[in-house]
Amino acid sequence: MVSFSKNKVLSAAVFASVLLLDNNNSEFNNNLFSKNAKGLNSNKRLLHESQAHAGDAHHAHHVADAHHAHHVADAHHAHHAANAHHAANAHHAANAHHAANAHHAANAHHAANAHHAANAHHAANAHHAANAHHAANAHHAANAHHAANAHHAANAHHAADANHGFHFNLHDNNSHTLHHAKANACFDDSHHDDAHHDGAHHDDAHHDGAHHDDAHHDGAHHDGAHHDGAHHNATTHHLHH
C-alpha cells in the first residue's frame, strides 16, 4: 500500500494552484491584449473615416474655419459653413472665407460677402457678388460689379441682362469704357462664355488660368457679360453702339 506524507500532498496542491493561477493570468492577459488590439483597430478605423470625411467634406455640417477645403465640389452638407475656402454649392454659407466672403463660390445660396460668387441667390453685402465682381446670375445682388443676369441688382457695374435697374459707372479707357457690346464684339483676342476673366476656360465661377464656364473675364472662352478683349455672344456691355 502506497502512503503519502502530508508534505507531499501539500506540495502537490500548491503546485496545482500555481498552474491554475498561471493559466487564469494567461487567459486574462490574452483577453486584455485582444481588447486593446480591437480598440486600436477601432481608433484607426475612426481616424480613417474622419480623414475621409475631412477630404470629401460632404458631411461637414457647420464646419468652422474650413480654410483648406479648396474647391470642394458638391459640398451639399456644408450648411452654414463658416470661413469655408472655395466651398462650391454652399447653401446659406454665412461669413465663410471665399464662400461667404467666398472666392469663386459656385451656386452659393444666400452667400454673404461672396467674391466672384456665381449664381448667388439673395447674396447680401457680398464682395464682388453683392458688391460682386463678375457674379453670374446673382439674384437680388446689391452693388454687383459686372454681374451677369442679376435679378434686382442695385448699382451693378456692367451687369448683363440685369432686372430692375443698374448704375453703370464706366471708368478708364479700356474695356470698361465700352458699353453694350453685341455678338462677336472683340477686344484683346479672346471670346467668352459667361462673365469671366483672366485668360482661362472656366466651368463655374473661377478665374486666373483655369478652365471655367461661368462668371470670369480677361482672355477666356466666354458666352455673355464679359470684358477685356473677347468675342461676346449675349448681351455684353463693354462696347458702345
From Swiss-Prot:
Keywords: Malaria, Repeat, Signal. The keyword RNA-binding does not apply. It comes from the Eukaryota. Residues 52-76, 195-231 have a biased composition (Basic and acidic residues). The keyword Signal applies. Residues 52-145, 195-241 are annotated as: Disordered. Pfam families: Plasmodium_HRP. Residues 84-145 have a biased composition (Low complexity). This is Histidine-rich protein PFHRP-III. Residues 1-21 form the signal peptide. It comes from Plasmodium falciparum.
